[in-house]
Every structure is written in C-alpha cells, then in structure tokens.
Amino acid sequence: MDLHGCAKNQVDAELIIGIMENLSWKNTSDPDEADLIIVNSCGFINSAKEESINAVLQAKAAHPKAKVLLAGCLAERYADILKNDLPEADGIFGNGNLSLLPQLIDSMFPKKTSDEKFIEKTLVPPQIGICGGERPKILNFPRSTYIKITEGCDNFCSFCAIPIIRGRLRSRPIKDICDEIKTFLKKSFYEFNLIGQDLAAYQTGKDDLSEDELHRENCSGLALLLKSISKIKGNFKIRLLYIHPDHFPLDILPIMTADKRFLPYFDIPFQSGAQKIIRAMNRNGAAEVYLDIIKNIREAFEKTNSPYGEPQIRTTFLVGFPGETDEDFNETIKFLKELRPLWSGGFTYSREEDTPSYSFKGKVPKKTAEARLAEIQNAQTSITEKKLDSFIGKEIEVLVEELIQAEDKTFLALGRAWFQAPEVDGAVVLNFNLNKKDIDGNPIAPGSIVKARIAARNGFDLEAVAV
C-alpha cells in the first residue's frame, strides 16, 4: 500500500487492506515481494496529482513483475483519461464504493489464462459508500486512529474539487461510529480523531437523519454524535478535525466542556479574512463572525475551568485566490493576528478544472502568491512560538509514538500532547530514564501515556521531561 493524500484517504487505505486480507492477500511493507502495489492517490491539487502519477510510474519501473493498481481520488476523478494515458497502471479503482474492489481484483488476477482477454481495467462505482468496514491494520502510530464520520461534501466552495471527487454528503450512522470506537477500545486504542470533509455538516445530507429527528433531540447532528460518544465507558480522547466555519454548531461546546475526554482542539479552515474573497469562495461568513465563533469557544472552556486551559485552534489559509489584492491579503493577515491560532496551514491557490473558480478572472502571479504565503507563514510562526512558550513549566500528558536511544542511560521519545494532531502539528521530545513508568505503571514504550513537564521549546516542537 503506497499512501498519498489526507487522513480520509488513509482510512480508505486501511479499509482496502482489510478487504484484501479478506480475499486472502497478505499485506507487506516490502514492494520487492509484492504481487500487487496499490497507489492510493490524491487528486485534490496539481502537486498532489503529479506526486500520485509519479508513484505509479516509479512502482512499475522498480517492480515490473508486480501489478500496479491506482486507487483513490486521482483514480476517481480522472479514470477515463488515465485508463488510456497511464498504461503503467494495470488497474484503476475509484473510491465511491470500496466493497466492489474484489470485482476488479478478480479481473486483474484471473484464475484462468484464457480469461485474460476479458479483463476490465477500470472500475469507478457511484459515490454511495459511507466508509464503514474492518480495518485490521492502522497506519498511525500505536493507540491513535482516525474515525471517519462522513463522506462527501455539500458546501461547494468555489475553489474545491472535493464534491466532484467524493460526491454529496453522506453520514455514517451514530451506532456504527460508536461501535467502531468500542472495537478499538478493546484493542487498547486511546486517541480517536474524528474526520470528514466537514464535521459540522454531520447528519445534514439528503439521506441522513430528518430535520424532525434532530429537532426532537433539540441539537445538531454533531452534538447528537458527541452525546452518544460521551456515553461510552473508558479512558480515551476525542479530537475533532475539520469543522466548516459557516455552520459551526455551538451546541457541541457544553457537551465537550462537560467531558474532559473531548479535547479542546478545533480545526476550522477559515481560508481568508477578506470579505470579498470569502464571498468569492462561495462562503457565507465574515471575519467578525468567525472571530465571534472563536470567542464563544474560548469563553465556554474558560467558564468551566477546563483542565486543559485555553482551547487551541488550527486553521487553514488559501492565498493567491483569483482577484485577491494586496488590501484583501492584508485583511487576512489582520484576521490571523486577531484569531491567534496555535497552528495554521498555508497554501497557494491551485486552479482546478470543473470548479467555479477555474474561470474566475484576476489571476494572481505565482511570485506574488508565494510571497503572500511566506508572509502569512512568518506571521503564524510568531504566534505559534509565543503560544508554545506559554506551555513551558506546565505538566501535560504525552502520547508516545516512538523511542530514540540517546547517550548513557537517558532515552528520548517522540510523542504528542493534546494540542498536537497527528502528522500536521509539532511534537514533544520526551527525556526519560529507564526507571520511569507511564501512567499505567508500565515501562515507557510506543503507545504509552506519560506525564511530563515542558522544559523548553525548539522551533515548533517542545522538549519535556518525564515526571
């Protein structure tokens, strides 16, 4: 499995591994021994497309005896083109209904030589899947996993191809999600990161719960899900990743503040602080409205004396959008400084065919967009460093991901604190002696939860000592 793209794609890769194992295939990390190499691709922006295509070319060149299957978003979006223009791919499989993968595998690996002429290279089912299934192999570090709660998106931001690739919004049933969490808890998992194209839209798709059902519960679909999760017994943490700001459900805040297993970490992709650009992106919000959301979040946790202290925000900014002027960009910088997120990701605009913004006028020169990206990243760096410095001297819990042996009898571990999401944020470098134990009294190892005191900051990472 050669994985590309986002956390949603990672869950798909894990589901595919489960399907393949049910077909009696064995997963291997060594491509030299593979009969089949699956490139689970990303098709979101141009750089990701190029990376995925190159992965297919490299896999076929390095392992000519293996068959190469292109799966994922690139396959979903461009199957009709790639089945002719990418002969290195022996098979192409969309992500609309993963349960149909065995059909394509049977075609790629016919039981009789005479069946070769009947091979169907491409299978792109309609977007009807809702991301459930067995995941025997988790591609994260120990005791942490992603839980996908939705597929598709109904927001139709003018720059975004996700609705084209993933289709309209579909929500997993609450029971299905809770049962999956319970299954992982039995396997000693600790951290669950809820993901989807937009968590705020959970249970608002046309085939989801009716408005009458949600009205009867007097809450949003996401709040209803969090209420159900809060009833699950056990020691675990829940992190919410990607909540669209235009319909942020404030009714989740009382649920989260009442249960410390919900981490006060909010991933809200604002994209811009300029009203004109926000509207051009087909979004309904405004900088002052977005800041009010953050104010509500911070006040909710402050009033309840949260053991975590201040909630932390991650966001995303897209610069160089068509028509973005220097004045517009300065409004975004101003918004960022008022927002004060701990983390933010920055990207330059990628012109994607079939999206509304593809035909927008006012193209921003590449050098200008890159200069704006550098400026917003520098502004964020200053904010991040100050916020990380505020943790120095405080005690936190660290989820250990891997061990690194240092000199003498001192050991190092890499891990994450509650305000660090997997892969995208900084890390905690943990110093400890062999006699130190984790919170369960066991030797410190990958997957351990360790109490530690923050001693220093090193760039975007923190240095800590086990206590």
Curated annotation (Swiss-Prot):
Residues 139-386 form the Radical SAM core domain. It is an enzyme of class 2 (transferase). It holds the Pfam family Radical_SAM. Its EC number is 2.8.4.4. It catalyses: L-aspartate(89)-[ribosomal protein uS12]-hydrogen + (sulfur carrier)-SH + AH2 + 2 S-adenosyl-L-methionine = 3-methylsulfanyl-L-aspartate(89)-[ribosomal protein uS12]-hydrogen + (sulfur carrier)-H + 5'-deoxyadenosine + L-methionine + A + S-adenosyl-L-homocysteine + 2 H(+). Catalyzes the methylthiolation of an aspartic acid residue of ribosomal protein uS12. This is Ribosomal protein uS12 methylthiotransferase RimO.
